[in-house]
Amino acid sequence: MGLNLRKNHPLLKIINNSLIDLPTPSNISAWWNFGSLLGLCLIMQIITGLLLAMHYTADTSLAFASVAHMCRDVQFGWLIRNLHANGASFFFICIYLHIGRGFYYGSYLNKETWNIGVILLLTLMATAFVGYVLPWGQMSFWGATVITNLFSAIPYIGQTLVEWLWGGFSVDNPTLTRFFAFHFLLPFVIAGLTLVHLTFLHETGSNNPLGIPSDCDKIPFHPYYSIKDLLGFALMLIPLITLALFSPNLLGDPENFTPANPLATPPHIKPEWYFLFAYAILRSIPNKLGGVLALAASVLVLFLIPLLHVSKQRSMTFRPLSQILFWTLVADLLILTWVGSQPVEHPFIIIGQLASFAYFAIILILFPVVSALENKILKL
């Protein structure tokens, strides 16, 4: 037997078994592209982020100016910043579609993979939040103030916890310095968790659109899915580069062009678009602690999804009632996202409350009930 380095070398064989000779279902659709797209997003964000960190100064008196300097005086600094800022949006688009795919096709029944995935989402949200504070514009400062303040709703230890988090009695220089440290560290935590996520995935192999075992018909990942992933890369990079070059501030808040001022509150404090659904749920409850719990529950509910699966079928491919419910949930999330961007006044308050109620009702009550009904109708 000739020495096949790819299959025998201690390091190369890990790469080989993950990216080249990996047995993959023959019928997975484009919805299975988002895992590799998320990997691409992560690599891109780490590279652009590293280049930005070389020119950034984490100090309240210099942060805003250092970002402006980067965009004006550093070679291609404007491009690196625009790719990094909009890359975050694409990261979230991909992760939301990836989660939606997992939900639709019952991929959450790979429980370890799913749970690590939810932890990855939480880490990504934390990273994006602390990153948004770094340019030290108005929305950075007030966003940080509002969101960190939520910890003060925790009974007994809340106030102490918030002051410990701030490193003082308000969001100030210590807060900015530690947020920069977190923003530098967390992407590497995400990279580590991604490897754990893949390790668990490769224990069971990928799910497929039919939700049935596919061991009888597997094909090697390379060249079939490596070339398919390259197409996905192109289809994501083209809109990203277009956005970064033609309309880089489309998704940002104009308030952030004003340096942070603790004495002037912006008229509408709101997070980046990818947090608006959770922000709408937070605002829909007229009680601080209740809102914080609902906010946490809006993401943590994902941990419960494998436990709420009562259908005898894995995927929703042949479950039309669950499909209707799924797309209703998608529409509901879009409504929440829109409401989160609107001021707190009639009719947005009641719309937000109804949409928040619908979100939890669909996931926790209607999905299990409808799944049980489908089992009965189909005599499963």
Curated annotation (Swiss-Prot):
Segments traversing the membrane: 34-54, 78-99, 114-134, 179-199, 227-247, 289-309, 321-341, 348-368
Positions that bind heme b b566: H98, H197
PROSITE patterns membership: CYTB_CTER (PS51003), CYTB_NTER (PS51002)
GO BP annotations listed: mitochondrial electron transport, ubiquinol to cytochrome c
Cofactor(s) for this UniProt protein: heme b
Gene3D superfamilies tied to this protein: Cytochrome Bc1 Complex, Chain C
Note on how the cofactor is bound: Binds 2 heme b groups non-covalently.
Membrane topology recorded in Swiss-Prot or TrEMBL: Multi-pass membrane protein
Chain sites annotated for binding heme b b562: H84, H183
Main localisation: mitochondrion
GO CC, one annotated term: respiratory chain complex III
Keyword Zinc-finger set for record: no
Residues at which a ubiquinone binds: H202
Entries under InterPro entries matching the protein: Cyt_b/b6_C, Cyt_b/b6_C_sf, Cyt_b/b6_N, Cytb/b6-like_sf, Cytochrome_b, Cytochrome_b_C_euk/bac, Cytochrome_b_N_euk/bac, Di-haem_cyt_TM
Pfam families from the UniProt entry: Cytochrom_B_C, Cytochrome_B
Subcellular location: Mitochondrion inner membrane
An example Gene Ontology molecular-function term: ubiquinol-cytochrome-c reductase activity
Record keywords: Electron transport, Heme, Iron, Membrane, Metal-binding, Mitochondrion, Mitochondrion inner membrane, Respiratory chain, Transmembrane, Transmembrane helix, Transport, Ubiquinone
PANTHER family from the UniProt entry: CYTOCHROME B (PTHR19271:SF16)
Function: Component of the ubiquinol-cytochrome c reductase complex (complex III or cytochrome b-c1 complex) that is part of the mitochondrial respiratory chain. The b-c1 complex mediates electron transfer from ubiquinol to cytochrome c. Contributes to the generation of a proton gradient across the mitochondrial membrane that is then used for ATP synthesis.
Note: Heme 1 (or BL or b562) is low-potential and absorbs at about 562 nm, and heme 2 (or BH or b566) is high-potential and absorbs at about 566 nm.
Subunit (UniProt): The cytochrome bc1 complex contains 11 subunits: 3 respiratory subunits (MT-CYB, CYC1 and UQCRFS1), 2 core proteins (UQCRC1 and UQCRC2) and 6 low-molecular weight proteins (UQCRH/QCR6, UQCRB/QCR7, UQCRQ/QCR8, UQCR10/QCR9, UQCR11/QCR10 and a cleavage product of UQCRFS1). This cytochrome bc1 complex then forms a dimer.
Family to which this protein belongs: Belongs to the cytochrome b family.
Protein name: Cytochrome b
Taxon lineage: Eukaryota, Metazoa, Chordata, Craniata, Vertebrata
